[in-house]
């Protein structure tokens, strides 16, 4: 009965304390003591139930312990574990590796010191030993004598010899120069007789009473008695000739005397040296305390010199190997030999030789014919079929650029060519390209599995690539089987592939982006480019700039190294010339047809500048256009704007004002750009509003006026824009329209003949007409122009530096184009431009 009453209590206690291991232990011990009151028979009856309870309880305990371990403990597997000092295992490992390296370096230093000590001991033994004591030397070598330098070097070399390797040691290894034995007397032979103090004192007093020779010499020696770290106390280099004593007496400048006085002082010094009475000297760490005494007979006419610092190292360690035995005799050089008189005539001749090709050719030519040379195309090594095509086009004479570059390019040399705009650069590299293709096709080395591409021409814009392709096809119209293809953006990728496979393509003209797309998409173009012979980069300063540099590098990696490379541009800054080493060989030619100190623009192009408030620019441009149209019946005008959307706004405004205008910018489709470009080439009385896509290389004939609204990106871009007029030696005008806060750009153009002119007075009727036309333009075009204008001037370093001022200028531009308030920017765009939180820049929520 009692047993039945106690069992429920035990079960309740188990459930209450089963969650902790401590409670389980207490429960187990208390239940074991509770059965002690029973009699032995009853206890035996209760043992089965007790055993059952113990087994269940033990299982519960083990399960609870396993659960406890799973929750509150973890294995030593993954996860960060720290070592002493808060280091992880990699830091701990690197620390011990560093300690091991330091320990190894210490051992090597100790071994090096032991080696140097052994070498010094060996040298002393050889230099001081008796030449006749062969038995004694043999005994020392048999017992514990020092190792020779050869033996020690061979022992060190054997440490690094792998097992099984051949021993390549020979007698030629080791010291190059033999030590001169017998040059020094033995240390045992030094006179060890007692010093005659009376003789020493009398001689000292005698010399001091005369001219203090001993005092000066003693002071000179004592000044050198202490040596710096790692220096020697050897006195071998301290003996000088007595004749030089007058020049070696900084402590006694009035020292002078006869030979007898010098002899008396020398005798005293000789006594001191022979008796070893220099006293004990204090040496620092790693200093040598060895004194090498010279013989009496050989040093009678010598004495100690305190200023002879020819040697500061130990002679015992290196002997005479660290001394230059023969001194260089300084000959007396006159001022005339050092600075010869300048020959004025020779300097003038050198300067005349360095004149540019431009100035030289101008002397030979007529004054009105500025770009053509006297050389004809039929005088050069050009194929007859190409000459026939040139004659059909009316081209007979070469330009100066073609005359200077054609011979170099036809010889297969790499060249970097700088020439003015509109001087025939395209023809200068197309003719060598055609000759390269003809030579490669006639050589017929091997049979190509795929049709090879022999010439690759890179251009920055689509219009320029299309223009060069048209010129190349005109030159190849009499050649059969030679084709010119273009790879430019704005066309279908699949159509480009089909055209390359179906039509002949020995000359490929491409823009970097589309060419890289074909290379990376494994269209088979890479294998065709492996037979490339000539690589041409037109407008190299732009293609090798930061914008195209990565794409050009990837393209160059796919081209063979054995090729000819040509780089052409009207402007070549120093940075671009450094980067040009990626394309050109080291021995390339640099052909500058402009010349140092010459103006990079054409002389026949009149350049002017108008500084006017930015709010009046959209009123001034129509006024300037109408004024030029009235003065020039056969006008052809190009208006350059900063961005594509500002170009679209300017085009829409001029169209609303009933002007004959066209537009080209990057936002337009390629078909539209090609049609407008061809129309502008063939027509007159037309106005082209464009962005920088038409600034480089485009040959628009008979352009009479170029207007640049706002500052260009840099000086080079201004020159390229202006180069659209005045081509082929003709005249033209260039006008730069800037705001007052853009005056800083004029400092970059100070070497150009830019004439400032005042802004014209605007009629109120013209202003009203412009305002009415601006009000008709869609708001979306204005907002896009505002965003593009803000992004452009934010990227310009001078204007984008001060964001608050930039916001004020943007608000002025906003009001000038007819917007009541500036349109909001996306938050992400504002953050990228650094305009978040700037007053006057609204953010779209």
From Swiss-Prot:
Residues 289-298 have a biased composition (Acidic residues). It catalyses: ATP + H2O = ADP + phosphate + H(+). Its EC number is 3.6.4.13. GO terms for molecular function: ATP binding; ATP hydrolysis activity; RNA binding; RNA helicase activity. The keyword S-adenosyl-L-methionine does not apply. It is an enzyme of class 3 (hydrolase). A motif (DEAD box) lies at residues 538-541. ATP binds at residues 419-426. It comes from the Eukaryota. Pfam families: DEAD, Helicase_C. A motif (Q motif) lies at residues 375-403. The keyword Nucleotide-binding applies. SUPFAM superfamilies: P-loop containing nucleoside triphosphate hydrolases. Residues 406-590 form the Helicase ATP-binding domain. CDD domains: SF2_C_DEAD. Belongs to the DEAD box helicase family. PANTHER family: RNA HELICASE. This is Putative DEAD-box ATP-dependent RNA helicase 33. It comes from Arabidopsis thaliana (Mouse-ear cress). The lineage of its organism: Eukaryota, Viridiplantae, Streptophyta, Embryophyta, Tracheophyta. The gene is RH33.
């Amino acid at each position: 009965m009692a047993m039945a009453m106690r069992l429920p209590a035990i079960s309740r206690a188990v459930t209450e304390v089963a969650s902790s291991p401590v409670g389980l232990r207490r429960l187990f011990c208390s239940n074991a003591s509770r059965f002690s009151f029973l009699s032995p028979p009853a206890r035996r009856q209760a043992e089965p139930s007790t055993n059952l309870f113990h087994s269940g309880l033990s299982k519960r305990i083990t399960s609870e312990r396993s659960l406890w371990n799973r929750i509150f403990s973890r294995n030593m597997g993954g996860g960060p574990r720290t070592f002493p000092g808060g280091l992880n295992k990699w830091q701990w490992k690197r620390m011990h590796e560093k300690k091991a390296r330091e320990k190894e370096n210490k051992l090597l230093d100790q071994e090096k010191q032991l080696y140097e000590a052994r070498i010094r001991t060996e040298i002393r033994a050889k230099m001081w030993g008796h030449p006749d004591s062969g038995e004694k030397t043999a005994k020392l070598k048999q017992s514990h004598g020092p190792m020779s330098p050869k033996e020690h070097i061979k022992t060190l070399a054997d440490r690094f010899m792998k097992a099984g390797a051949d021993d390549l040691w020979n007698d030629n290894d080791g010291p190059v120069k033999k030590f001169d034995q017998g040059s020094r007397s033995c240390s045992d032979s030094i006179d060890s007789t007692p010093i005659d103090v009376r003789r020493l004192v009398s001689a000292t007093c005698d010399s001091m009473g005369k001219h203090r020779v001993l005092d000066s010499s003693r002071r000179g020696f004592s000044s050198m008695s202490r040596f710096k770290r790692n220096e020697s106390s050897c006195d071998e280099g301290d003996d000088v000739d007595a004749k030089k004593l007058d020049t070696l007496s900084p402590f006694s400048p009035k020292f002078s005397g006869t030979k007898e006085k010098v002899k008396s002082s020398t005798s005293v010094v000789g006594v001191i040296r022979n008796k070893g009475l220099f006293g004990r000297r204090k040496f620092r760490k790693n200093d040598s305390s060895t004194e090498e005494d010279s013989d009496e007979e050989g040093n009678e006419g010598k004495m100690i010199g305190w200023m002879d610092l020819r040697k500061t190292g130990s002679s015992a360690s290196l002997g005479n190997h660290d001394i230059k035995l023969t001194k260089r005799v300084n000959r007396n050089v006159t001022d005339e030999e050092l600075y010869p008189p300048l020959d004025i005539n020779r300097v003038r001749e050198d300067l005349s030789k360095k004149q540019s090709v431009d100035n030289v050719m101008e002397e030979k030519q007529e004054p009105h014919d500025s770009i053509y040379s006297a050389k004809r195309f039929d005088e050069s090594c050009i194929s007859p079929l190409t000459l026939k095509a040139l004659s059909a086009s009316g081209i007979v004479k070469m330009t100066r650029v073609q005359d200077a570059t054609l011979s170099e390019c036809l010889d297969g040399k790499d060249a970097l060519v700088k020439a003015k705009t509109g001087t025939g650069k395209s023809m200068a590299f197309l003719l060598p390209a055609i000759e390269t293709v003809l030579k490669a096709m006639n050589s017929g080395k091997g049979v190509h599995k795929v049709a090879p591409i022999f010439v690759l021409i890179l251009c920055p814009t689509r219009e320029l690539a299309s223009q060069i392709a048209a010129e190349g096809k005109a030159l190849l119209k009499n050649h059969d089987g030679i084709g010119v293809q273009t790879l430019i953006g704005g066309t279908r990728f699949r159509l480009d592939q089909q055209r390359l496979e179906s039509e002949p393509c020995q000359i490929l003209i491409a823009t970097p982006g589309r060419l890289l797309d074909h290379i990376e998409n494994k269209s088979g173009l890479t294998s065709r480019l492996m037979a490339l012979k000539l690589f041409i980069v037109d407008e190299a300063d732009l293609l090798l700039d930061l914008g195209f540099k990565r794409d050009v590098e990837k393209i160059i990696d796919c081209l063979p190294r054995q090729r000819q490379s040509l780089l052409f541009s009207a402007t070549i800054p120093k940075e671009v010339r450094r980067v040009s080493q990626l394309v050109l060989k080291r021995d390339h030619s640099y052909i500058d047809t402009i010349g140092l100190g010459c103006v990079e623009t054409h002389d026949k192009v009149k350049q002017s500048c108008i500084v006017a408030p930015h709010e009046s620019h959209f009123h001034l441009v129509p006024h300037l256009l109408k004024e030029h149209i009235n003065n020039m019946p056969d006008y052809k005008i190009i208006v350059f704007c900063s961005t594509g959307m500002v170009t679209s706004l300017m085009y829409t405004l001029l169209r609303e004002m009933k002007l004959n205008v066209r537009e080209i910018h990057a936002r337009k489709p390629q078909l539209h750009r090609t049609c407008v470009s061809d129309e502008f080439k063939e027509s007159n009385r037309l106005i082209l509003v464009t962005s920088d896509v038409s600034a480089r290389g485009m040959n628009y004939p008979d352009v009479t006026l170029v207007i640049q609204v706002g500052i260009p990106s840099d000086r080079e871009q201004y020159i390229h824009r202006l180069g659209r007029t005045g081509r082929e030696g003709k005249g033209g005008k260039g006008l730069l329209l800037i705001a007052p806060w853009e005056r800083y750009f004029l400092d970059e153009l100070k070497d150009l003949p830019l004439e400032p002119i005042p802004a014209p007075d605007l009629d109120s009727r013209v202003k009203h007409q412009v305002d009415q036309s601006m009000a008709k333009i869609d708001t979306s075009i204005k907002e896009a122009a505002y965003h593009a204008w803000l992004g452009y001037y934010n990227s310009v370093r001078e204007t984008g530096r001060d964001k608050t001022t930039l916001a004020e200028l943007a608000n002025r531009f906003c009001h000038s184009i007819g917007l009541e308030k500036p349109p909001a920017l996306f938050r992400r765009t504002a953050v990228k431009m650094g305009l978040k939180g700037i007053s006057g820049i609204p953010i779209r929520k």
